[in-house]
Design a protein with these regions (language model features):
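Conserved adenosine/adenylate-binding substructure
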Residues: 144, 214-242
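Short, glycine-rich nucleotide/cofactor-binding loops
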Residues: 147-153
């Protein structure tokens, strides 16, 4: 039982926006479903200033995997209620030769991560005319470590450890992700408490990636998968990109 998900990319008319990605696939009931995706990378881009590297291709791939993982509900798109076979078609990448070299490794690693079978079909991207204005500037040499900051207890402990481990006058760069809103509230609550109580003052900055399904953009209302197994991949990709 293979589900083929077509990736559609629509370029933006403005350099302020990266463009829009959407998914299209045949539903379990035979009806074609489409959904648009959020992919707001402005804060990450303000640090890396990059849309042409293999790291950016990996970020795009990870964002798409995360959204496909959410869109394809296990109990409807698998024989046993869990293990899905998903083919992602027309994944746009800048560095297609490098991505094809890594294709088998990507598939094996993500199959292990989510417990599914994934097949990736890459196509050559024409690139992105993305250069948003009103972005902060960063001095990269001020940062000694990157810490993935979800707002959960494990990532909070990792952040605290990093902040105490780094050299004097250096900072930790926190990388966060939000989709549903609750994640951001948890992250903000923690950092607001740090600020109000002068905890780790001057020891960190945070960049937020807003990526996920646009819930009101489904062509046909669909229940989404809630196991979030691929979210860690998106975090790693965002950290590598930054």
């Amino acid at each position: 039982m293979e589900t083929v998900v077509n990736i559609i990319y629509t370029p933006s008319n403005s350099r302020e926006h990266i463009g829009e990605f959407s998914l299209s696939f045949d539903g379990f009931d035979g009806e074609t479903r489409t959904v648009r995706l959020k992919f707001d990378i402005k804060e990450l881009w303000s640090f890396s200033r990059d849309t042409s590297s293999v790291a950016f291709d990996f970020l795009v791939l990870s964002m798409l995997v995360y959204n496909v993982d959410r869109a394809i509900k296990r109990n409807r798109y698998s024989i046993d209620g869990w293990h899905r076979t998903i083919r992602m078609a027309n994944i746009p990448v800048i560095n297609i030769d490098a991505m094809n070299i890594g294709k088998d490794e990507f598939e094996r690693a993500i199959c292990f991560l989510t417990g599914d079978a994934w097949i990736f079909d890459f196509i050559q991207s024409e690139g992105y005319e993305y250069a948003p204005t009103n972005t902060p500037s960063y001095k990269i040499d001020e940062y000694e470590e990157i810490s993935l900051f979800s707002g959960g207890l494990d990532s909070l402990i990792g952040f605290i450890d990093s902040a105490h481990r780094i050299s004097q006058n250096k900072k930790v760069l926190l990388i966060s992700h939000m989709e549903l809103g609750k994640e951001k509230r948890d992250q903000v609550d923690i950092l607001t408490n740090c600020k109000n109580n002068h905890i780790l003052d001057g020891k960190y900055d945070r960049l937020l990636l807003n990526a996920g399904l646009k819930p009101n953009s489904w062509s046909t209302h669909s229940a989404t998968e809630s196991t979030f197994r691929s979210r860690s991949l998106l975090f790693f990709a965002a950290g590598i990109y930054a």
